[in-house]
């Protein structure tokens, strides 16, 4: 990909959200010289696939935030989308600026608890410092409870135990099997074996009873945490890895009738929003029968940018079919397990492919910048 198209002045793609899908789409549009504006509420892309390690390993966080303006220049707007007017083909920002679009890509992503997701609207340097502060809290804590045993929870427990083998790590999960339900049973079993081998204590089929009263991510010696079954654990710190929520606020008013129950947008096989030929949804905010993953957002971006270009050049549109699942779990920098196109892959391949650098170098390449050492 990447040549110049002869376009008239009416073409302008607005991309709402600068996560994995939005930055991939913007980078592709840039390479094709298609006029675009990327809008995000923050000043930097967050490579949150590596966020858990940034919370554990000092000096790593600076590799996980990448400036938008350095990459996209005048094609980037920092701002919050407060309204979308599909009739006038406009996106309205909180400062009153109105961005006209010929095509709209909604890539608003999802939120979840820190450190897996970063929810504050602060500048890049302050964001990096927030992770460095978390590293210090973990260093002080001898006993750490990780709440939630999906992909984020098992990776978090493994990251801490790899960096600090002497700490007591307890993982609590409301179900009997760990990681995501879409994964092969063999993968989920190996996840459990890796954690046990590392010395993580597992409390399965248990739920924390007073989760809203906990103060997560802070050292607090000898906290007593109770489960609904009456189990008590005494810990110095709690880390929440308890699931995600779709960021729908930018589009809920305009497209409420096109939303699934979780807030994701209903799309057709071309990833077009139902009822619109020039509006697309990608990544976590697209209602697709597949796990919410950075890898999928990148695939969506490819399809959508191709479809925008094909629609401008009178070519047929590409379809997106969720395929057999590819899902790699990094269990610390020296271990991992997963599956590729539905087939099991073991420790060596996953460690080489993901666990060592968690794809951070790939994001710096996508953004055309040099990663800090």
Swiss-Prot record:
It is found in: Lipid droplet; Cell membrane; Cytoplasm; Mitochondrion membrane. GO terms for biological process: apoptotic mitochondrial changes; positive regulation of apoptotic process; vitamin K metabolic process. One of its GO terms (cellular component) is lipid droplet. SUPFAM superfamilies: FAD/NAD(P)-binding domain (SSF51905). Its EC number is 1.6.5.-. The chain crosses the membrane at residues 13-29. It catalyses: ubiquinone-10 + NADH + H(+) = ubiquinol-10 + NAD(+); phylloquinone + NADH + H(+) = phylloquinol + NAD(+); menaquinone-4 + NADH + H(+) = menaquinol-4 + NAD(+); menadione + NADH + H(+) = menadiol + NAD(+). A NAD(P)H-dependent oxidoreductase that acts as a key inhibitor of ferroptosis. At the plasma membrane, catalyzes reduction of coenzyme Q/ubiquinone-10 to ubiquinol-10, a lipophilic radical-trapping antioxidant that prevents lipid oxidative damage and consequently ferroptosis. Acts in parallel to GPX4 to suppress phospholipid peroxidation and ferroptosis. This anti-ferroptotic function is independent of cellular glutathione levels. The keyword Translocase does not apply. The modification by 4-hydroxy-2-nonenal (HNE) adduction in mitochondria results in loss of the oxidoreductase activity and activation of a novel function in mitochondrial oxidative stress signaling. It is a lipid-anchor. The record marks 173 as: 4-hydroxy-2-nonenal adduction. The gene is AIFM2. Binds 6-hydroxy-FAD non-covalently. Belongs to the FAD-dependent oxidoreductase family. It is an enzyme of class 1 (oxidoreductase). One of its GO terms (molecular function) is electron-transferring-flavoprotein dehydrogenase activity. The modification N6-acetyllysine is found at residue 167. 6-hydroxy-FAD binds at residues 17-21, 53, 81, 284. Its cofactor is 6-hydroxy-FAD. Keywords: Acetylation, Apoptosis, Cell membrane, Cytoplasm, FAD, Flavoprotein, Lipid droplet, Lipoprotein, Membrane, Mitochondrion, Myristate, Nucleus, Oxidoreductase, Transmembrane, Transmembrane helix, Ubl conjugation. This is Ferroptosis suppressor protein 1. N-myristoylation at Gly-2 mediates the recruitment to lipid droplets and plasma membrane.
